[in-house]
């Protein structure tokens, strides 16, 4: 009991969200300022390229993934509070009427996606479509993690078990292959060089405008962008074709249109919200949740510190008092409510 009273949580990171990304560029590509090496041959990148080009395949994942299972690894109690069905977290910004951005435009129509029956419907449609395209099953899916991040390996394990239980029920559809990346320089060694097929990652807003939330997905023509999914590059290289190519380019156009709206903020927010909803509804990205604050032992009242929904203000310790005792969860909650 004494030890329990010495443990509380870090202050939540409200401007960050986690989501699942597909790699639409599984092959080597030379940008002017960066080289993507792509997926290793043992993970069958040709097979993957055909699969990820199928909206039915991606939507099977959209409805098969239960975010609660992954979040429960780090938040065994209260994980429902961290689930998201959008990429932008709530309370990020609001329009002139006080409507939260996540309730604007097309985002207002989104809710939790997890639905096993729907997932299997899309899987069955994908099997028929991909069999005709020459895809072999099970589809290998490299799913990497950073061993330096606490519990990421456990999250990968429960993710694999949960998703395969849904999508492999009655048919050997996928094989999620968990791989350990390096603990140092993980971004450059894995995500930025496209050495994955599916992975969970995050984005933190830089400023309080929805344009900041498009950076992991939007790319200008010929540009490497922020090296997340390589959506536009996949189209430019002819890997992403047909319906999916049309969806990708429509998203790019929606973002470009939203960026031009600078005088009517309500219209701007609605346009960006429509683009984000379009991205999610077509399973070009799959929401997961907000970061779960870790449990810590501290003598700081973290709620006295500076706060901003974006940027690094919450990392500053100016004005925070050092107490003569460790903060319990009861005191932590009282400090939060008193701010």
Spans of features found by a protein language model:
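Extracellular/periplasmic solute-recognition and catalytic clefts
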Residues: 1-36, 73-74
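Loop/turn elements at helix/coil->beta-strand transitions in domains of secreted/extracellular proteins
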Residues: 3-7, 53-59, 66-68, 137-140, ...
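Generic recognition of flexible, low-complexity loop/linker segments
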Residues: 6-10, 46-48, 59-60, 108-111, ...
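A generic structural motif
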Residues: 9-15, 166-183, 230, 316-321
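Detector for C-terminal structural segments
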Residues: 12-15, 60-104, 151, 155-161, ...
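Extended ligand-binding regions for polar small-molecule ligands
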Residues: 24-71
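A solvent-exposed, charged loop/short amphipathic helix patch at secondary-structure junctions
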Residues: 35-48, 100-110, 224-227, 231-232
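Ligand/substrate-recognition segments at binding pockets and active sites
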Residues: 78, 111-117, 121-205, 244-248, ...
């Amino acid at each position: 009991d004494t030890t329990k009273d010495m443990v509380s949580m870090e202050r939540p990171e409200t401007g960050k969200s986690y989501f699942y990304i597909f790699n639409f560029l599984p092959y080597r590509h030379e940008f002017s300022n960066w080289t993507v090496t792509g997926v290793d041959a043992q993970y069958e990148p040709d097979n993957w390229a055909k699969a990820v080009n199928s909206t039915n395949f991606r939507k099977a994942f959209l409805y098969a993934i239960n975010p609660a299972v992954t979040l429960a690894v780090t938040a065994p109690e209260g994980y429902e509070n961290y689930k998201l069905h959008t990429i932008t977290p709530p309370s990020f910004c609001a329009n002139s009427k006080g409507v939260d951005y996540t309730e604007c435009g097309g985002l207002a129509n989104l809710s939790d996606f997890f639905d096993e029956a729907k997932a299997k419907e899309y899987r069955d449609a994908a099997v028929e479509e991909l069999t005709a395209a020459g895809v072999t099953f099970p589809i290998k899916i490299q799913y990497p993690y950073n061993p330096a991040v606490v519990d990421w390996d456990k999250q990968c394990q429960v993710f694999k078990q949960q998703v395969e239980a849904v999508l492999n029920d009655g048919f050997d559809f996928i094989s999620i292959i968990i791989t350990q990346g390096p603990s140092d320089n993980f971004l450059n060694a894995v995500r930025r060089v496209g050495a994955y097929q599916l992975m969970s990652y995050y984005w933190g807003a830089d400023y309080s405008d929805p344009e900041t939330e498009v950076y992991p997905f939007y790319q200008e023509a010929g540009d490497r962008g922020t090296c997340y999914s390589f959506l536009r590059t996949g189209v430019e290289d002819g890997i992403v074709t047909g319906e999916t190519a049309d969806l990708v380019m429509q998203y790019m156009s929606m973002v470009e249109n939203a960026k031009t709206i600078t005088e009517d903020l309500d219209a701007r927010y609605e346009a960006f919200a429509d683009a984000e909803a379009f991205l999610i509804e077509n399973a070009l990205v799959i929401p997961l949740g907000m970061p779960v604050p870790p449990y810590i032992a501290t003598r700081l009242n973290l709620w006295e510190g500076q706060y901003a929904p974006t940027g690094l203000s919450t990392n500053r310790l100016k004005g925070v008092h050092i107490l003569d005792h460790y903060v319990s969860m009861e005191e932590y909650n009282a400090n939060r409510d008193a701010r």
